[in-house]
Amino acid sequence: MKKDVQQGEVTGEVFTRPEVVAYMLNSVRHCGKFKSLVGLRVLEPSCGDGAFVLPLVEAWLSEKPDFDSVDADSFLRACDISSENIEKLRGAVRERLIAASCARARANALLASWLVCGDFLLQEFKERFDIVIGNPPYIRFDDIPSAKQKEYRAMFSSFTERCDIYVPFFEKSLALLSDKGVFSFICTNRFTKSSYGKQLRRLIADRYHVALYLNMEHTQPFVQEVSAYPAIYIIDHNRNRVTYSATIDDAGIPTLNRVRMGQPKSELSVFKQWYKGDSPWISTDCREREAADKIARTFPTITKSAEGTEIGIGVASGADDIYINAQRVASIEPSCLLPLVASEDIHDGRISWDERYLLNPYDDNDDTQMRDLARYPLAAAYFDSHAPKLKARYCARKHPHDWYRTLDRVKYALLRSPKILIPDIQLGGNVALDECGSYYPHHNVYWITSRKWNLKALCVLLRSSFVTSQIRNVSVQMRGGSIRYQAQNLRNVHIPAWSSLSEGNVEKLVSAYESNDTEYLDAVVDAVVRDSTARQPVRLFQADLFNKEECPVCQIEHVPDR
């Protein structure tokens, strides 16, 4: 990330390729039916090197505008926090204005009103804009100065949890749209499924209309290579219109031409209704969305599939270098050590333990209480040797008498409970069973316990494509195609109720537990799923699940099979 010398802040600059800019500009003009730019007001909230501003100015100049008109003064507002960017862009725009026969003095006057150096989120705008377009900065939460975090939280309802700075850029930019205005950003797609994006998704659903959502997470639409998981968004106020959507694998001109709005042979899927409220945007294909909706209507979630079924995450110590494997550097009472299983210990649904231990500061018999270190002199000496670092943590300052506590409470009963263990980031289906209650999970491992389920049967269900596909729908995509099995995602998974499974079906699932043959496992699960409900069989990605006339969320055409 680049830092602005004058401001001393991370600017989050990622510049957009010209063909992608052209696609966005054409889409905005099509959506807003803007035949001419003259008389319009355009806003670019984070103009950078002018990837959007320069083509906009050139298109405006091609229409032979009156440079001395009020319309010329109000045509453009472009902001950037970098004074260096603003100066470079000022020179480039001035050059184009003068080349188009605009007097230098008038060009300078236009530039004075057009280009603004400063924090867009803190700027005040009296006018509303017909086009808001750009590529907002991608600055992670931890790189936002704490003073500005507080300021943004007070100003923007969408700035929740640990969200990145593009989220309030969305909120403010949308608020500046005119009634007939059109908004378009290219930026990460993280908010469409993440927890921190809930408020922004709800704001968009309640007040605006998504005209286009083009998922480009497997492409590289930027000048430099970055891991941004990008998407193009076009949003307006026309809430009675359809939504166009697609996922593309490259950002080249031929592909972009195939997903242009208004083209008779476009490969865009068309939704009669986009996602409601804060629901995650699970798919760009309306057939997949309806299939997922049908699963949700047919089956309960995991925690509701049987009484006493719980989902949780392993322990975060707040100082792994101190709490994990302390026995390798010091003598520790064995009763203070818990076998700890981490994500790297789980491969192909099996546990291969690396003999790491967690130094447990909590009482084994009452995990709401800390250990009495007077009874454990070796552990006490070890904690004392690390006291400065442990006491400096926020959780220790908040509980000074319990300064040696872990960040999360260690629940000793969980260690001895049979449980399913699921690494967070994986390609899918890597689900293991701690049948005897031998391990405590680390914070990158999620766990499931149940009083009713046969855990081998549940484990097979969770390994199947039936469940992996659901996780993939609600998870953000990671590098290499990995997905996240976070608790929030697991809680959105729907499976047959335990009570709906016959003894024979339970036996089929259990018999498949030892198999590494995914096709066999999927066939078993598919048969069990079909048999567990009297309704029409449900397959998340069955190609012929719906004809286009049957699909209740679609209109016109689906994305052609590719």
Model-derived regions: residue spans:
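A secondary-structure boundary/capping signal
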Residues: 116-117, 187-188, 342
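Signature of N6-adenine DNA methyltransferases within the class I
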Residues: 9-10, 14-25, 47-54, 81-87, ...
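S-adenosyl-L-methionine
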Residues: 90-122
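Short, conserved catalytic or adaptor-binding loops enriched in Gly and charged residues
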Residues: 66-70, 102-110, 203-207
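Glycine-rich, phosphate-binding/catalytic loops in enzymes
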Residues: 58-63, 94-96, 148-152, 200-203, ...
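Polybasic, glycine- and aromatic-enriched phosphate-binding surface used to engage nucleic acids
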Residues: 280-511, 518, 524-528, 550-554, ...
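Short, well-ordered loop/turn elements at secondary-structure boundaries
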Residues: 37-38, 71-76, 110-111, 126-128, ...
